[in-house]
Each structure stands twice: as structure tokens, then as C-alpha cells.
């Protein structure tokens, strides 16, 4: 009977102490292995960051080439120029600075009303055109 019990429990009796919170076997090289693993992780992270920085630098060079080719300014440069223009306009003013008017707004002449009327008159028959022109 003892033999059967030993065979059934076998190595479980050795592990019982560990399961109940007993002392675990400590690997003498565990600290060294953990340190090496941490170093490898740190090194991999540094390599990843360096690769990312290199790719970003290449992208920025490409973006700058496109900006130069098409005469596009960076967003920061445009904002700085707009801010400087607003500050320059408001130096002698006692009121708050006005918002900059976008280019193209208000540049049209006041001939729009007449041009619309002229356009409508063009589509009228000849005698009616003469009436409206007088």
C-alpha cells in the first residue's frame, strides 16, 4: 500500500512545500539573467527610437523639398507672420487689434450689381433691351 501511495503522489510531495509558500529554489544566475534581459530590452528600445528618429528626419527632408518646390510655408511660419502683421498694425492703436482679413475678401469692385443687371438685359429680346437701356 505504501508503494502505491508513493507512486501516486510521486513528485507531488516535493512540490507541496512550494505550493504552501515554502522556500523556492533560487537560481544563482537568476539575477544575472534578469539583468541581461533588462539590458537587451533597453538596447532594443534605443534601437527602435533611433530608427524612428531617422525615419522622421527623412520624412521631414522630403516634406521640406516639397515645400520648397511648391512655395509652401510651414504652418508655424504662417502663424508667426500673421501674428507679426497684427502686432505691427496695432502698435499705434489704442483699441484691440482687428483680425486679419483673408486675401481676396473685399477686393471685388462694386460693379457687381450693374453686371448682374446687364447680364439679365442681354437675354431679353431686342425691343425690351432698348427699353431698359433708356
Curated annotation (Swiss-Prot):
Gene3D superfamilies: Single Helix bin. Residues 29-64 form a coiled coil. One of its GO terms (cellular component) is postsynapse. Keywords: Cell projection, Coiled coil, Cytoplasm, Exocytosis, Neurotransmitter transport, Synapse, Transport. Nervous system. Strongly expressed in brain, where it is predominant in neurons from cerebral cortex and thalamus (at protein level). Its main location: cytoplasm. Residues 15-60 have a biased composition (Basic and acidic residues). Residues 48-70 are annotated as: Interaction with the SNARE complex. GO terms for biological process: insulin secretion; modulation of chemical synaptic transmission; regulation of exocytic insertion of neurotransmitter receptor to postsynaptic membrane; regulation of synaptic vesicle fusion to presynaptic active zone membrane; synaptic vesicle exocytosis. It is found in: Cytoplasm, Cytosol; Presynapse; Perikaryon. GO terms for molecular function: lipid binding; SNARE binding; syntaxin-1 binding. The keyword Cytoplasm applies. It comes from the Eukaryota. Belongs to the complexin/synaphin family. Positively regulates a late step in exocytosis of various cytoplasmic vesicles, such as synaptic vesicles and other secretory vesicles. Organizes the SNAREs into a cross-linked zigzag topology that, when interposed between the vesicle and plasma membranes, is incompatible with fusion, thereby preventing SNAREs from releasing neurotransmitters until an action potential arrives at the synapse. Also involved in glucose-induced secretion of insulin by pancreatic beta-cells. Essential for motor behavior. Binds to the SNARE core complex containing SNAP25, VAMP2 and STX1A. This is Complexin-1. It comes from Rattus norvegicus.
